[in-house]
Amino acid sequence: MQNPNKILQLFGIPFTALLSVLFGLLVISFPIGIYIVFETDIGDDINYDYPITHLDIFHDTNFYQSSFELSIGDVFVILWMFYLAIFVFSILGPKQNFLKSISSLISMGIYDVKLNYMFAITKWLSVLVLISALINFIQESFGIITVPPLGDNNLIQFFYVSLAPLLEEFVFRIILVGIPLFVLYSSRSSLRYFLKCLWTPSSLNILDSKKAIFIIIFVGIAFGFAHIAFGDSWSEGKFAQATVGGIILGWVYFRYGIVVSLLIHWATNYFIFAYAYFISQINYVSLETAFSHPLMFTLELIFLSSGILAVSILILNRFYLKNF
């Protein structure tokens, strides 16, 4: 039988090439986001100086339309810098840098995404997009259309999709997955160990992962339901996509930690919409039209190709681990 490392190398060359392209696109999305918020008319009658206290999410609270001086632009920059810091951190660690990780797959057929966060991010992001596309294709063949929530203002919507990953990962991963895992599997109770396990649940000594998988699936279903449960939410067609996405993010958090799940979630929100709004603004077309632009089709094609290779390598790696 052929050397498994040679076969992984064969798949690894196009796979790492695609991951490198995705990495470059992720990097470029950072300045694109700044450009959209501060240099375009995305908000129409409002701009980045719009008070954060006037957002509808604070309606019926004492914070709503208060004198607190903080604008959408201020909070966006804070979020942007936070994501950028985590992004840079993910390139460098936890054990080796991104370039060395992809080089190892090409040169030696060594495949271990745990060595670098960015390797895991680009790989699992591709898998998530691939599965979401398959779900969408199947649902549309049965006449189930996924309709996004109607946003009153594109600037506010872009702000929300930038904020959502941080809030949702804190609630659905750290609180609803991380803490139960610690309660079930921890043999120590120090604060430092608790925080370490919330950051990277794989730090726990988990010999039987059945309970962990149940928690991940249950929270994934709750994550899917949360996307359709409210009046201004997605249509029912989003439930399956969001549920599977929640399960994948939960699994990724369980295996690799909050850095990976957070940045994958960020990419599915900020990254996608940054390119779509950029196309919309420079071509003076609607957001819906922008999503049909050849550039968005090219992005989707890159994701799907990378996702197919990622799944193929996962299957090959598991097969050879069992047989060699």
Give a label for each model feature:
Residues 22-26, 78-84, 117, 121-133, ...:
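Alpha-helical transmembrane spans of integral membrane proteins, capturing the lipid-embedded, hydrophobic core
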Residues 1-118, 133, 137, 273-324:
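N-terminal, membrane-interfacial amphipathic/helix-forming hydrophobic leader that caps
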Residues 155-324:
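Transmembrane helix-loop-helix hairpins at the membrane interface
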